[in-house]
């Protein structure tokens, strides 16, 4: 079992003007997949704040998977991808590519996603959209393969040649 954290990035949710619906949904999907969600938080669309909490969570060493939701669009305040790129030491471009590819079967607006994914220390950080529907679709597209990546990242023995339903 891996530990996970969910970070909602939204000015309106942070100010209490709108309930956070994507963050709890993402946390529930993770729990259903066997992850232990050990931390959730809401931050405003401010790059320094996002970077700070990404560094704090990844730096604590207790979370292997950190999912963000929100801030991946074209709005001038959508800066989650930039914050993610600023803190990650290794990028994992296949994850957002897979999410966009899967989402293109639902809507051609998927090509507008600027989501990123990467690694900081032993934590995989993945950006999800802020819409609950899109967050679910994107997470469901990649979740089956993430455990294998997390096993490799954590140094657990994993047979890279083994076939699985996630491939």
Language-model regions: role of each:
Residues 1-167:
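Non-catalytic beta/alpha edge segments that cap or flank active sites
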């Amino acid at each position: 079992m891996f530990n996970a954290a969910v970070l909602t990035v939204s000015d309106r949710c942070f100010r209490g003007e709108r309930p956070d619906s994507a963050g709890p949904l993402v946390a529930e999907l993770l729990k259903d997949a066997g992850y232990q969600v050990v931390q959730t938080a809401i931050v405003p669309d401010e790059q320094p704040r996002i970077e700070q909490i990404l560094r704090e969570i990844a730096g604590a060493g207790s979370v292997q998977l950190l999912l963000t939701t929100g801030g991946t669009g074209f709005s001038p305040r959508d800066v989650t991808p930039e914050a993610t790129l600023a803190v990650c030491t290794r990028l994992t471009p296949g994850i957002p590519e897979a999410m966009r590819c899967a989402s293109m079967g639902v809507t051609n607006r998927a090509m507008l996603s600027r989501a990123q994914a990467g690694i900081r220390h032993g934590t995989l950080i993945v950006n999800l959209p802020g819409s609950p529907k899109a967050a679910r679709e994107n997470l469901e597209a990649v979740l089956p393969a993430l455990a294998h990546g997390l096993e490799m990242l954590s140094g657990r023995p994993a047979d890279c040649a083994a076939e699985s339903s996630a491939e």
